[in-house]
Amino acid sequence: MTQPNLMSDRSTRILRTAGWSIAALLLIAPAIAMKFDHTGVNWTASDFIFAGVVFALVGGLFELAARASRNISYRAAVVAAVASGFLQLWITLAVGIIGSEDNPANWTYIAVVLTALSVSAVAIGNPRALSRAMAVMAGLQLLFCALHLVDGHFTAVIDLFFTSLWIMSSRLFKRAADQTTG
């Protein structure tokens, strides 16, 4: 008998295969787009290497989550947290959230991601600790949002989007902890 809050091995295999396939397609897409002159896509070898490393890290985090717990809420929490971190890192390094990617205020987004990675590494496998860590990330995101506003940068919409992902992750980790302890 399977428990409704646990993911089956078959479902895990399907999602893992789909995830790595999507990462490969996302890496191949710019190469295909570059074959057409009118697309404006012009990646260098270093762009492909960077994207490959980032996709491998994201995939690796999902693999760690799959091994850490079969709980669906736990895995969904990881997806929300990784999505927030990945999007902040990708957007900041590609074009910048505040002005261009060279604006030093963009480092606040990288600081959030690095903090999330650090606290998650310490708490991995402990959904209750991860829930608290993601709540702290939401608070840090809001703190930086306030600092951006004081500095004259209106980033509230995107900051609140990232904050909502951290809160979603926190709530899902809490649900996973509650399901684990009964």
Task: Please provide the spans of the model-predicted regions.
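N-terminal membrane topogenic signal
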Residues: 7-22
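Membrane-embedded alpha-helical segments in integral membrane proteins
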Residues: 23-39, 62, 85-95, 142-143
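Membrane-helix interface "capping/anchor" motifs
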Residues: 66-75, 121-133
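C-terminal halves and exits of single transmembrane alpha-helices
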Residues: 82-110, 114-124
